[in-house]
């Protein structure tokens, strides 16, 4: 039996495909390549010595989904596909709702028709909005989202919650993760944003390699220890392992299951700059600029439920995150376009 990974050519998706192939799973990838590259899957093959079957296309394409379910014996879906930039979502809300919400609805409907009942959803800490309690536990209030990206994730969570109640065959696992960083230690796959990066670590590493002149630090007047935003940064390989653990724990385990995937530690933007400089012996030029719309001051997790129920704990620390980020960037200065 195979696992369908939507968005499997993307940053988190490709790292998860590596973990699945490494434990002998058969993997089918669907990706429209709007913010990813097919080269990532070639690199996955280099790392694992195994190949994922690839379909280029969109989760909104019912006919293609029907073809995939007909041609492959799929028993589980891990759903990464979607648009993911907070700032862009404020400018393009309808695109985000169409891709992230309508796309997931189509996928769930076609899974049901095909009799595929195991679903792992790539959600986000943004569903917590501006959190009232830190660290954030899974039972903290959701829905007070501050941008359309977060709202789209929250809406999908509600759809999954209602679907799990209405259709008892479904095993729905929601993984709310915090800020993925780093890259595979081989340096073969990593985060490869189009244009100016929206995420911090690619931005820092592109300054380090000389691709960008300096880092823009969005907001220096937050109520944090140094005025810059505090986040829970998690190594992408730890995150990928979390998906595998969730799949193994809840395969054919009907109902709704929700977990935070994070380290439980918060670091500011300037903490991250200093950590990168220290780990890689490089100076990063930066400037303090205005806050970015939709951003909040502080967000980090309590990941103890995942430890208790999934046996999952983030193992890779800040230094490893920085070293692996730089190893990927210096070996691939233009990302997958090299």
UniProtKB/Swiss-Prot annotation:
The active site is at residue 149. GO terms for molecular function: UDP-glucose 4-epimerase activity. NAD(+) binds at residues 11-12, 31-36, 58-59, 80-84, 99, 124, 149, 153, 178. Substrate binds at residues 124, 149, 179, 199-200, 216-218, 231, 292-295. Gene3D superfamilies: NAD(P)-binding Rossmann-like Domain, UDP-galactose 4-epimerase, domain 1. GO terms for cellular component: cytosol. Coiled coil: none annotated. Pathway: Carbohydrate metabolism; galactose metabolism. Its cofactor is NAD(+). It holds the Pfam family Epimerase. Keywords: Carbohydrate metabolism, Galactose metabolism, Isomerase, NAD. Changing residue 333 to S: In strain: RM 7004. It catalyses: UDP-alpha-D-glucose = UDP-alpha-D-galactose. Its EC number is 5.1.3.2. GO terms for biological process: galactose metabolic process; monosaccharide metabolic process. Belongs to the NAD(P)-dependent epimerase/dehydratase family. PANTHER family: UDP-GLUCOSE 4-EPIMERASE (PTHR43725:SF47). Homodimer. Involved in the metabolism of galactose. Catalyzes the conversion of UDP-galactose (UDP-Gal) to UDP-glucose (UDP-Glc) through a mechanism involving the transient reduction of NAD. By controlling the internal galactose concentration, it may be linked to the biosynthesis of lipopolysaccharide surface molecules, which are important for the pathogenesis of H.influenzae. This is UDP-glucose 4-epimerase. The gene is galE.
């Amino acid at each position: 039996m195979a696992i369908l990974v939507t968005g499997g050519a993307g940053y988190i998706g490709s790292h998860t495909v590596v973990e699945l192939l490494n434990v002998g799973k058969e993997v089918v990838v669907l990706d429209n390549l709007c913010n990813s590259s097919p080269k990532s899957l070639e690199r996955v093959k280099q790392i694992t010595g195994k190949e994922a079957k690839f379909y280029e296309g969109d989760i909104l394409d019912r006919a293609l989904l029907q073809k995939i379910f007909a041609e492959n014996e799929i028993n589980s879906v891990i759903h990464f596909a979607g648009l993911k930039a907070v700032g862009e979502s404020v400018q393009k809300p309808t695109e985000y709702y169409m891709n992230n919400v309508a796309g997931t609805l189509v996928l769930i409907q076609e899974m049901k028709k095909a009799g595929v009942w195991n679903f792992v959803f790539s959600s986000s800490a943004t569903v917590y909005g501006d959190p009232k309690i830190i660290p954030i536990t899974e039972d903290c209030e959701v829905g007070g989202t501050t941008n359309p990206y977060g709202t789209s994730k929250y809406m999908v969570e509600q759809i999954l919650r209602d679907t799990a109640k209405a259709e008892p065959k479904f095993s729905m696992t929601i993984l709310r993760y915090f800020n993925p960083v780093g890259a595979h230690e081989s340096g073969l796959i990593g985060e490869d944003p189009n244009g100016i990066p929206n995420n911090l670590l690619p931005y820092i590493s592109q300054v380090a390699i000389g691709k960008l002149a300096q880092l823009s630090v969005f907001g220096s007047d937050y109520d944090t220890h140094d005025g810059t935003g505090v986040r829970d940064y998690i190594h992408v390989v730890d995150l990928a392992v979390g998906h595998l653990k969730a799949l193994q724990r809840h395969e054919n385990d009907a109902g709704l299951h929700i977990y935070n995937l994070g380290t439980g530690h918060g670091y500011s933007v300037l903490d991250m700059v200093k950590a990168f400089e220290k780990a890689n012996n490089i100076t990063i030029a930066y400037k303090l600029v205005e806050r970015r719309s939709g951003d909040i001051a502080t967000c980090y997790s309590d990941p103890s439920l995942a430890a208790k129920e999934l046996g999952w704990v983030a193992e890779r620390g800040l230094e490893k995150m920085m070293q692996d980020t730089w190893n990927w960037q210096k070996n691939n200065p233009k990302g997958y376009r090299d």
